[in-house]
Amino acid sequence: MNLDGTSGGFPAEEDHHNEERQTKNKRKTKHRHKFSEELLQELKEIFGENCYPDYTTRKTLAIKFDCPVNVIDNWFQNKRARLPPAERRRIFVLQKKHDFPVQAHSFLSCQETQAAAHNYATKQSLSGAQRALMRRAGCSHLEKQWIPSQEMGYNCFSLENQETPSQQVGPQCSYLEKPGIPSQQVGSQCSYLEKLGIPSQQVASQSSYLVTGTEKHPGCAMGYGGDTGSGHSGSGHSTAYHFLSYNSAECLHPPPSSVPYFHGERTETKESQHASPFLLDYAQGAYGVKKDHCLCSFCLSLLGQQQQNDWQYHLQQHQQPQNYLEGMMLQEQLPMDSGPWDLGKQWSSAQSQLQSQLPQNNGKPLCSQLQHMSLQIAADSPLLPLGQDMQERASEQPRTQMQQL
């Protein structure tokens, strides 16, 4: 720099740089669009009606005022920015909730705007509560209405709070009205039967065929899904199929298609019970009541085909096996004081003897006869409670020692 404060360059170059800077500044600036008083008044009226106009409205205003659409957008944006904070907040909330049209009250004071916003929030909360109540009322109404069998599926339980008639339930096991049977236990048994692929008719018959006592009364009603007739036992809309059931049920049968079971009857107390084929020492019913063991005399099976005769299903029993006499002869050879845990040894020896006695079919033994023999052996073996046989053996050991002494 010189002593006079001027730069040491040429003045022509400095003027050239200044001109370039001025031209750049001019290029960046935009001319502000000015509306007339009439147009401004019209824009203010539109802004008072809706401060967030849609694209169609803005496009119409741009054509009418002979200006680009972005000019209309900028004017509305600047107009909204000049509103009070409370009013802007209220308009923003309404715009987010898509509650159109939104009216801007620019002439209101801040206190009035806050009061209006508070009232709006209160109304919104009340309307939300009313919607929730309406939804709940709708759900309760749907729950109370009658439900057809197609929509309910195969639910055997949880029908206490629904006004569903037994005729409309169809093949489902509804209202097992036995004294003292919790519906949850009956439902769990029925659902277990259905998970294993048992038809609904068998499920209904299984759930209705409940054993203990001798008093008989109608069991689970099954509605026929086809042409509903009248004049049969039950109502006029559907036919109720009544199976033999008993006064107080303590157990439900396992599914007949998966596992066979043994059926025995005591003539002294007129009580009948079912023992599982897993050779349990004692059976436990639905109430948790322990049932003492019994000698099983014959095998009852529900695997027979269900025939429809006069609108009713009848359970058929299988005939006794052909090798019944051979089984009785083999049974006499087995010791009578053996427990359930000795069945494996008995069965291995019995199987070897039976294979030598039974006729051969194409070089293979008759498996069906062996199966019936296994059932006969299990039926003739006494079922002792847990630990009873061990206690008897432990008590017999000191007796034998005393006799030897």
Curated annotation (Swiss-Prot):
DNA-binding region per Swiss-Prot/TrEMBL record: 28-87
UniProt-recorded Gene Ontology molecular function terms: DNA-binding transcription factor activity, RNA polymerase II-specific; RNA polymerase II cis-regulatory region sequence-specific DNA binding
Basic and acidic residues biased stretches: 13-23
Biased composition annotated in UniProt, kind: Low complexity: 346-360
Gene Ontology CC annotations of this record: nucleus
Subcellular location per the Swiss-Prot or TrEMBL entry: Nucleus
SUPFAM superfamilies: Homeodomain-like
Keyword hit for Transferase: no
Keywords linked to the UniProt accession: Activator, DNA-binding, Homeobox, Nucleus, Transcription, Transcription regulation
Ranges annotated as biased composition (Basic residues): 24-33
Chain residue ranges for the region called Disordered: 1-33, 340-363
InterPro entries: Engrailed_Homeobox_TFs (IPR050720), HD (IPR001356), Homeodomain-like_sf (IPR009057)
GO terms classed as biological process: regulation of transcription by RNA polymerase II
Pfam families, per the entry: Homeodomain (PF00046)
SMART domains membership: HOX
Purpose of the protein: Transcription factor that acts as activator.
Protein name: Cytoplasmic polyadenylated homeobox-like protein
Gene it is expressed from: CPHXL
